[in-house]
Structures are given as structure tokens and as C-alpha cells.
Amino acid sequence: LRYLQKHYWKTKYSFNFPRMRPSENGGFQPNVVMSDRELAQVTFATRIFDHDVDISYSTRESASFRDNMARLGVTTMSAESKTEPGGYYSYPQTLEQFHVSDERTAKEVTLALKNLGIEPVWKDWDQSFDAVNCQEHAATTTV
């Protein structure tokens, strides 16, 4: 990371530590499963290493774990994620790549963050996320 920051200093860097989960179709089973405690330790170590880097948590993590980590170093979270190919355009749900643990709607995630004293900021640089439709799509919330 330090090399990249030195040579590409105008770039913003981020980390995501998605835990490998068994696939819904049973094809993939992880050899090692990282505990909540271990993921928290990796998150804290990363935050100590670099206080400016973004740290993202996906909907693979449980709602309670994401809520608890929101004030402890995580900067972005997804909401209403679809994990199957074409999942935002094709229904019904087929070929899910992995299980989504946090199944809350974007509105529910927003409310949970507000209840923690965090002001959610929606991704606003893509035309598909306008103020009218932001709650109908998966979104990224900056915390």
C-alpha cells in the first residue's frame, strides 16, 4: 500500500475483507472460516496501519456485526446486494454465488446507521442512483 500511495498519490485506496462463505449451490466450501473476532482484528489492524484508507463490509456479514463495526473503522457498507449473475435485472433469484447475511433493505440499513449517530451518504456519482430511486437499488453507504 505504501508503494502505491507513494507512486499513485492521487488515488484513494480501499480494503474489503469478504469472508468466504459456502456457495448456495453447494459447489464451494471454504477450508477456513474466519470468526467475527478475527475479522474485527484485521479491521482494527488495517485502521491503525492507515487511518485514511477505506474499509468496506459487504452484506456477507450479519446485520448485527456490521452495525457494531460501523463506528469502529468501517467506512462503506453495501445494502440490498444481489449475488447472482444478472441479479438486479432477472427474477426470480437463481444461481446465487454466496449467501447474503444482512438482508435488510437500504432504508433499514440507513435507519440503523442513523440510530448509531452516523449520517449515511449514498453513492451519488452514478446516474442510476438518483434521489427518487436510491432506495429501490443496491447502494453503498459511507459511514
Give, region by region, the residue ranges found by the protein language model.
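Conserved binding/catalytic microenvironments
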Residues: 3
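Auxiliary Fe-S-binding modules of radical SAM enzymes
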Residues: 6-143
